[in-house]
Amino acid sequence: MNKKRPNGKSHSTRPVRSGAPKWVRFTREEVELLVEELAKKGYSPSMIGIILRDQYGIPLVKQITGKKLTKILEEKGLAPKIPEDLFNLIRKAANVRRHLFEHPKDKRAKKGLEEIESKIRRLADYYKRIGKLPKEWKYEPEKAELLASGAAS
């Protein structure tokens, strides 16, 4: 079954570049230390990328270090247990479920929850296949409430 809506195409394209830009003054080791410090402060991988871009002038970690940001976090043992995109979907589903508890006749929200949970299952299957999630991992809405509330990230 196809997705209900196609993904948007409106965004800027990254320039094709093999190495780090000339104007970046950080070395590979300095960038890895910055990533580690920000992760220890509790920032998510996407937030770390935004902070590095906006405050330190580092456009892409991979151009400087040769490794993706999540790979650096995995090497340091700071990677999240559940991939960030899956965790965000779980949190979104928990919020919609909470809304439905207060407004049980909201049919649009019910349909939206079905779509979100379908997306969670598809993404979980992918992460199980590539080995980022254990094979026995299963999405359960009750446990998702605990995850989304910040019990584990």
Curated annotation (Swiss-Prot):
Gene3D superfamilies: 4.10.860.130, S15/NS1, RNA-binding. Residues 1-14 have a biased composition (Basic residues). Residues 1-20 are annotated as: Disordered. The keyword ATP-binding does not apply. GO terms for molecular function: small ribosomal subunit rRNA binding; structural constituent of ribosome. InterPro entries: Ribosomal_uS15, Ribosomal_uS15_arc_euk, Ribosomal_uS15_N, uS15_NS1_RNA-bd_sf. One of its GO terms (cellular component) is cytosolic small ribosomal subunit. GO terms for biological process: translation. CDD domains: Ribosomal_S15p_S13e (cd00353). Keywords: Ribonucleoprotein, Ribosomal protein. The keyword Ribonucleoprotein applies. Signal peptide: none annotated. Belongs to the universal ribosomal protein uS15 family. Part of the 30S ribosomal subunit. This is Small ribosomal subunit protein uS15. It comes from Sulfurisphaera tokodaii (strain DSM 16993 / JCM 10545 / NBRC 100140 / 7) (Sulfolobus tokodaii).
